[in-house]
Amino acid sequence: MTALPVIDIGPLLTMDDAAAIERTAGTIGAASADHGFFYVEGHGIADALFERLEAASHAFFALSEAEKARIAMVHGGTAWRGWFPLGGELTSGRPDRKEGLYLGEDLGADDPRVAAGWPLHGANLWPDGLPELRGAVEDYLAAAVAAAEALMRGMALALGLAADHFATGITRRPTLLFRIFHYPPGGVADDLGVGEHSDYGLLTLLGQDAHGGLEVRAADGSWIAVPPRGRALVVNIGDMFERLTRGRFRSAPHRVINASGRERLSWPLFYDPDFAASVDPLPIPATTRLLSRWDGGDVHGASGTYGDYLIGKVGKVFPELAGKALGDFG
């Protein structure tokens, strides 16, 4: 593999051309099985919205450390929201060379999930004096979720299921996590902005600025660059989709090395199962191509809810926060 497939998902947004829907779903299914990564165009997110988000993100990371620390993750409690400093996240057991802002579906205290004390559910933390950040994030998140829902329709059809199979099941109330990551300039070839990992949930929809650094590990073990392609999103399959499909869809390892000499921004949306859902494999044949995972883990042998799986993962990313924020859930 030298380049990822490029897929226009417009037909899955409008759902008004049966032949185009079938073709698009088939292409998504093939890309998910062969690569686990692909570019998405026709996603419905306007260029102007990307520009607003990029400008607001730069403005946030230009704030002083003291200003950003006012909304540090330690203040986010079980919601797991807020800012973390450079080196504050350990994706694969060593500090990543990035800082970031953890966000998600903005839920008030009256939401049943928040009232029940569910981790990773709650209110976002926003900096004072930067209202454009909240506006840009909320508008972008709404558009990106619509694109994710369209992709999930395509995934269902590719698997021979009804288009609304997931929307009426494990993503009826999805876990929505959104991040803004800032990679400073000055990295070198072996300086990992994000260490090798796979994503935990169903789908990741990644927006990125013009400075590359993302790499995906191909099935043959080689690393393939995933450079920006205009405002196309990069979509990848997560662990739970690999589990659901009995290995048919591939949750591919990936990493970030920012060796561009310039700062880099990215905006991943993690579109994941309902926190309380049991992610049981679909009644389809298991692939004969089950490969050893990069981390030695076994998503196919996992048990419990998606929340159980997710908490077990995020507690390793922020070990110092895990005990305080996750409490009895950790």
Per-segment meaning from a language model:
Residues 1-330:
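Peripheral, non-catalytic segments flanking oxidoreductase cores
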